Amino acid sequence: SVPEIERATIVSGILIGLQNKSFRKSYQIDKAPSQLVEDLLKAIERVLESNGMGGKTKILLGEYGKISQSNKLAISEYIRDNETGKDEKNTLLRDIIHELDVKVFPFTEYKHIGYDILGQFYSEFIRYVYGDKKLGLVLTPQHITELFVDIARPNVDSVVYDNCCGTAGFLIKAMKRLIELAGNDEAKKKHIREKQLIGVEERSDMFTYACSNMMMRGDGKSNIFQGDSLSERVKDKIKAFKPTVGLLNPPYSTSVSELEFIYHNLDCLDSGVCVAIIPMSCVLAQSGINYQWKKKLLEKHTLDAVFSMPDDLFYPTGTVTAIVVFRVKTKHPDNYETYFGYWKDDGFIKTKNVGRIDYHGRWEEIKQYWTYNYHNRREIKQHSVKRHVTENDEWCAEAYMETDYSLVTPSVFETTVQDYVLFRLRNGIE
């Protein structure tokens, strides 16, 4: 088998290479694995260049070039058959290409929806590969990327920025919304793809997947940059685009506070709103580095809303999260009431071997209920509340909602206390 960490690169490269008609016709010709890899890399290079990837081509080819280092795919001329125990001719790479060519790539022939289907397959495959928490990534669930766009409510002229763009999930959802708003204006759609979607990603593998992910949706000139989004050099480049909507899921449990990534995203926005999902420990902090960043954020921006998300949203990881919404470049007013939502039930349930799914089809109705109440700032018992807060307060609905004691039984009380203790231990809260 091929290691998980290599699978995403291989599948990504093949799906790009198959867009080259010459390669798609010739890959089935009997040839050595090393020659097939060489042909694949040449096909990838041609497709990247034809899509206007420019200087990014070299970076992407550096990542895809790792395929040629795989002993099983590119070097060994013979491979051991696990069933017979005999060495047979190595056709593993050709077989993988054929499977993708037959079962996945044909969707691109459907002009209006094909590349989106291909892109969705690709996104889900990346999610499958990087879903292993041992790889150090927490990818945003698809329905949450969609929710972000509904919270931010971009207009057709919005410029969207994600400074931790990963595989470009937020940018893809934003692109889809902006293009829908553009209607039949093809010139505007072109402008959206080329000028209104901005991303930064530091990891070379994630940067590669983000670029290819956008390209598979017809966006070959996306402004996704590789680099440190906290550096002034990169920020100056981003500010030139005058972004108006920030969307991000910063990396968790690194040496940099998640709130710092939000601060730098806001610093790059010309106006508008920033929506981010972060560990609950960040919004609860009343001391330490997260507390300091809470204070800095309120000195320059307005905390518009905080939503407490389902505890198992990032299952199988144990990260409990909250979505925060900031209005840009206006100091948090002394008398401003922040909206707090208790969004703990998104309708998804955990299923064996599949993870969390919208098994009962409740998500769309729940999402509309959440966003309608937020945009109209409705206070609803056991669901939402408005409060004036400072950096000294806990930024979560649970701290301000009235408790319905009729629902509290001894067993519920015991379970809640146990969950609370575990939560504080997991998040390092004293």
Which residues are covered by each model-predicted region?
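Non-catalytic, well-ordered alpha-helical scaffold segments
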Residues: I5-G13, Y115-G119, S123, Q142, ...
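Short coil/turn segments at secondary-structure boundaries
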Residues: P3, A8, Y27-K31, K133-L139
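Conserved aromatic-histidine-acidic binding/catalytic patches
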Residues: V2-P3, R7, E88, P106-Y110, ...
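Long recognition/docking surfaces used for binding and targeting
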Residues: I16, S22-Y128
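A conserved structural/catalytic subdomain of Rossmann-like adenosyl-cofactor enzymes
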Residues: Q226, I238-A240, T244-E430
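Conserved S-adenosyl-L-methionine
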Residues: L135-S255, E260, D267, P279-S281
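Non-catalytic accessory regions of SAM-dependent methyltransferases
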Residues: S1-S26
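Alpha-helix C-capping/helix-to-loop hinge sites
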Residues: S1, L18, K103-T108, Y128-D132, ...
